[in-house]
A protein has these predicted regions:
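Basic- and aromatic-enriched surface patches that contact anionic nucleotides/nucleic acids
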Residues: 1-30, 38, 144-191
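N-terminal extension/subdomain marker
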Residues: 1-78
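Short alpha-helix boundary/capping and kink motifs at helix termini
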Residues: 2, 26, 30-56, 85-151, ...
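Proline-rich intrinsically disordered, low-complexity coils
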Residues: 20, 58-61, 68, 88, ...
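Short linear motifs in intrinsically disordered/low-complexity regions
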Residues: 77-78, 97, 188
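Membrane- and cytoskeleton-facing regulatory interfaces of eukaryotic small-GTPase pathways
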Residues: 78-79, 86
């Protein structure tokens, strides 16, 4: 790091409150300053929310982002390309949330509420995002011999269940539509 970059580095820490690692990522062009600052604001909101009793949390509705080009966001570690390669026949359907929960395999069921210690951090981040007007991708479900499984979006599903959202969109593989439809009703629209 040359002297000019070092001065920028120090200024990012002093003037913007960045950690040394955050400042380094900005200097090296790995992240934009505006993104780092936005993430810091989100993290502060999350930490503040986690300290509140669950009765004091906001209960924002889930706004679903159903645009196919962003379905890959329903699962961790996927890009648009890798999602399309792994799930070339992905499609969106709407389901009754309670019916889906009843038919989930035991490993996919959330038996605790979204405020339990296992889920509280992710729930807080989700609630902050939704409360700020953000949208989220639908959960993805698959079928195998054990039943239905949520393979992406369990926290979003859990929050929708907590706020008693009656119907939710889910992503399925068209090749599994018939098998899934033997367990739950599938609709092509939210109404």
């Amino acid at each position: 790091m040359d002297d000019e970059d070092f001065q920028k580095f120090k200024a990012l820490i002093k003037e913007n409150g960045l950690s040394p690692l955050e400042a380094l990522k900005v200097i090296e062009g790995e992240q934009l300053l505006c993104n780092v600052l936005a993430e810091k604001v989100i993290n502060e909101k999350v930490e503040k929310l986690k300290k509140k009793h669950k009765a004091k949390w906001p209960s924002p509705p889930v706004k679903w982002d159903t645009v196919p080009e962003r379905w890959y966001l329903s699962m961790d570690d996927h890009s648009t390309e890798s999602f399309a390669m792994k799930f070339p026949d992905a499609e969106l359907v709407w389901v009754d949330l309670a019916q889906l929960h009843d038919k989930l395999a035991n490993g996919s069921k959330r038996v605790k509420d979204p405020f339990s210690s296992n889920y509280k951090c992710k729930t807080a981040r989700l609630v902050v995002h939704l409360d700020d007007g953000g949208e989220v991708s639908p959960p993805m479900i698959i079928h195998n011999k054990a039943g239905l499984h949520i393979v992406g979006g369990n926290h979003r599903f859990g929050w929708a269940r907590h706020i008693a959202q009656p119907k939710i969109p889910v992503i399925i593989c068209a090749s599994q539509r018939t098998a899934i439809a033997t367990l739950i009703d599938l609709d092509n629209s939210p109404t």
